Amino acid sequence: CIRDSMLTVREHFGKLKGLKLVYMGDARYNMGNSLMVACSKLGMHFVACTTKKYFPNAELVAQCEEYAKASGGSITLTEDVQEGTKDADVIYTDVWVSMGEPDEVWTERIHDLTPYKVTKDVMKNAGEKAIFLHCLPAFHDLKTKIGKEMGERFNLTDKEVTDEVFESEQS
């Protein structure tokens, strides 16, 4: 997923070095960590935009800061959606609950991460040139079995990204 995402970004922008990639959501696990490592080694500016509870492990952040220093990139952790997404080239998210985690974590994640949902306003703040990426599968509507179940259970029509963004030209 990471290699494919980086190839997509390079194809779209013609480069990777110097671009700003913002990961919104739970940045403690595979996608957030892998994107942070990749961006730091490729000279990109990685931003984890989430509540502090979901920031990446401090040791990994320190290692990635060293990689970024050598490559010309940077690592930023922020809870501020406006600040974090401003002038971003790439807005990236993933499902809020990883494979193998119990259903009980949904309530907590939805509560904690709803402010970090990728919306039209987030993309507008990033700018017209910004693109949206998702590792997939995405819960952006109620058309899947799990999407429908979560919608009924939590009275939601989407989770980590709105259907409007997921189906947009920026996606």
Where are these regions (language model features)?
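Glycine-rich phosphate/diphosphate-binding loop of Rossmann-like nucleotide-binding domains
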Residues: 11-93, 99
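Rossmann-like adenosine-cofactor binding region
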Residues: 65-161
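Short helix/strand-capping connector loops at secondary-structure junctions
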Residues: 161-171
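Short, small-residue-biased leader/transition segments that mark boundaries at the very start
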Residues: 1-2
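Short, structured coil segments at secondary-structure junctions
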Residues: 42, 126-128, 167-169
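Hydrophobic/aromatic ligand-binding patch that stacks against planar heteroaromatic rings
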Residues: 38, 122, 164
